[in-house]
UniProtKB/Swiss-Prot annotation:
Its cofactor is Mg(2+). GTP binds at residues 30-37, 57-61, 75-78, 142-145, 173-178. CDD domains: YihA_EngB. The lineage of its organism: Bacteria, Pseudomonadati, Bacteroidota, Bacteroidia, Bacteroidales. Transmembrane segments: none annotated. GO terms for biological process: division septum assembly. Mg(2+) binds at residues 37, 59. SUPFAM superfamilies: P-loop containing nucleoside triphosphate hydrolases. It comes from Parabacteroides distasonis (strain ATCC 8503 / DSM 20701 / CIP 104284 / JCM 5825 / NCTC 11152). Belongs to the TRAFAC class TrmE-Era-EngA-EngB-Septin-like GTPase superfamily. EngB GTPase family. Residues 22-197 form the EngB-type G domain. GO terms for molecular function: GTP binding; metal ion binding. Disulfide bonds: none annotated. This is Probable GTP-binding protein EngB.
């Protein structure tokens, strides 16, 4: 897929205020500092489209970007940042859950995982909840340029083995590096294949 245009449309905390219409939406979510904004900028080839921050948990809004005037890329708030207050965490949880469960246009949710770390309980529980809720999702392992190929292979095996303890089959999995633009074509082609199937 060639990205010809990518433009910011709206930020909000209320799923009812998301764009109207029936364009498919592909949302991206992950723990704070997983590299989500950098990945979005890499996918769209627009360096400043999604704001990157050195401060974990900075993104508190649902951000919609219109791609090629055909589909929306949705940047969801990061989850699991411990320094947020309890009230703030509960508010974020509601924002995320309301979008994921109530947004009919949500076509696929990309769950971002930092490949440098072992399987985290919060990520596994989140994906378990997605499965129980019938939400279609895929996994993107980020920052693959930050560790050796051997370590990457080892970490992926541990992660997939952990998932297969409760899953009959694995969701689609992608490997990415925002700095080296690895995984870009595979992720965009996957989105394009879903869009094509929706149009047929």
């Amino acid at each position: 897929m060639e990205i010809k245009s990518a433009e910011f449309v709206i930020s909000n905390t209320d799923v009812r205020k998301c764009p109207e219409g029936n364009k498919p939406e592909y949302a991206f979510i992950g723990r704070s500092n997983v590299g989500k904004s950098s990945l979005i900028n890499m996918l769209t080839n627009k360096k400043g489209l999604a704001m990157t921050s050195q401060t974990p948990g900075k993104t508190l809004l649902i951000n919609h970007f219109l791609i090629n005037n055909e589909w929306y890329l949705v940047d969801l708030p990061g989850y699991g940042f411990a320094q947020r207050g309890k009230e703030n965490r509960e508010q974020l949880k509601r924002i995320i859950e309301n979008y994921i469960l109530d947004r009919e246009q949500l076509t696929n949710l990309f769950v971002l995982l930092d490949c440098r770390h072992e399987a985290q309980k919060i990520d596994l529980e989140f994906m378990e909840w997605l499965g129980e809720s019938g939400v279609p999702f895929s996994i993107i392992f980020t920052k693959i340029d930050k560790i050796s190929k051997g370590r990457l292979k080892e970490n992926l095996k541990v992660y997939t083995d952990k998932l297969l303890e409760t899953w009959e089959e694995l969701p689609p999995i992608f490997l990415s590096s925002s700095e080296k633009k690895e995984g870009r074509d595979e992720i965009l082609d996957y989105i394009e294949s879903i869009n094509n199937s929706l149009n047929n």
